[in-house]
A protein has these predicted regions:
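Extracellular/lumen-exposed scaffold segments
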Residues: 1-130
Length: 130
């Protein structure tokens, strides 16, 4: 699994959208947010606090609904490459600079037979303050 972030450009006292791309290998999927069953680990993006930058909201992609031999009903999942959108707001006191918004992507990967132990991947969103 690979996680990358599209650089975001933001101006003081304005909003911008950052995109975190999640690429899941063929033959695997990760649970959607929200997951179908409460015992499954949802894909969840958490971001650290950076002075002058606030996260307004996070938008998870629409899930695919697929049937698997190990599940009693179809599951909401992400496969292939999918995007998580992050709405950011910059404080008016920010000065032009390059910053990084660090975070973590919490996922539970599965194949067509079984779900694996949940894991965490590092995320780093490049920010250009204009």
């Amino acid at each position: 699994m690979k996680v990358t972030a599209v650089p975001a450009v933001i101006k003081p006292y304005e909003s911008a959208e950052a995109i975190v791309q999640v690429s899941v290998q063929n033959g695997y999927h990760i649970n959607a947010n929200p997951p179908t069953f409460s015992y499954l680990k949802a894909t969840e993006l958490t971001l650290e606090q950076v002075p002058g930058i606030s996260v307004s909201f996070i938008v998870y992609p629409n899930a695919l609904t697929k049937s698997f031999p190990f599940a009693e009903k179809p599951l909401a999942v992400y496969e292939g490459t999918t995007e998580i959108k992050v709405r950011l707001r910059a404080d008016k006191s920010l000065t032009p600079s390059i910053q990084t918004l660090p975070g973590s992507l919490h996922v539970q990967a599965c194949d067509n037979q079984v779900c694996y132990t949940p894991g965490t991947l590092a995320v780093s969103i490049p920010l250009s303050i204009k």
